[in-house]
């Protein structure tokens, strides 16, 4: 339930929404505050079709302000029966021949949604990626570019701007074959185009090593205690001038924390889980090593334990 102002009660009260009638009713006096309202969110139920065709859901998705018609299109389905199949398929062909200026956007948005779902990203990131793609597409300058890389780069930038960054390698894993280099080039192109549009530098958000820590630790199956120690350590590492990328620092901290525990992880496994090369992890470890006594929590490891670590 939500709150709304009731003219009879003369104050805000809890209201109940009657889905069958479309009425919003005051829960205290029963006054209908709004009638015949339309729910624009997508339907939560789906009705399976045994014929193997698409599920015949009764309504489409929610309205989309990025599309010219708000996403409120009509699709001609195939009813049962041979004559019906012939009629509907003919109408369907004519419908497909009709001009739909949003067809390309719809396909792009579906691709972005699929990639985002595979990475477990929230709806706000999908919406931001859609918005970025629409702004670039409106400039009519992306023709001929790798579409998969472009969409993946939109998702990467959206993650950064929503303070939920993903590594390029993570984005690459769901990018339908686009390489890290192609996504990197597409990202630079998008940032340049958006900068030309607004006349300002595009805000990408700041990446911190801690942004990746919990996800990396989860990939390695680390215990809650080691995860906590890793998070505290990586946060403490920001106080020092360690000129390495946040992802490299996160990987090196995980290596150190696991070496101090009974659940030691091979460098190879950490490299696979984080996407950071083994050599890069070693170099980051070398930079962190002089500061370990101030970075590693005292409750997790004693000074003697730190001295037993391998010298870089």
From Swiss-Prot:
Family, per entry: Belongs to the TFIIB family.
Protein name: Transcription initiation factor IIB-2
Keywords of the record: Metal-binding, Nucleus, Repeat, Transcription, Transcription regulation, Zinc, Zinc-finger
UniProt xrefs under PROSITE patterns: TFIIB, ZF_TFIIB
Major subcellular location class: nucleus
Alphabetized SUPFAM superfamilies for the sequence: Cyclin-like (SSF47954), Zinc beta-ribbon (SSF57783)
The species this protein was found in: Arabidopsis thaliana
Annotated signal peptide: none
Compartment annotation: Nucleus
SMART domains from the UniProt entry: CYCLIN
Binding site for Zn(2+): 6, 9, 26, 29
Sequence repeat ranges, renumbered to this chain: 115-192, 216-290
Matches recorded under InterPro entries: Cyclin-like_dom, Cyclin-like_sf, TFIIB, TFIIB_CS, TFIIB_cyclin, Znf_TFIIB
Gene Ontology annotations for the cellular component aspect, listed alphabetically: cytoplasm; nucleus
Keyword flag Nucleus: yes
Function comment: General factor that plays a major role in the activation of eukaryotic genes transcribed by RNA polymerase II.
GN (gene name): TFIIB2
Molecular function terms from GO: TBP-class protein binding; zinc ion binding
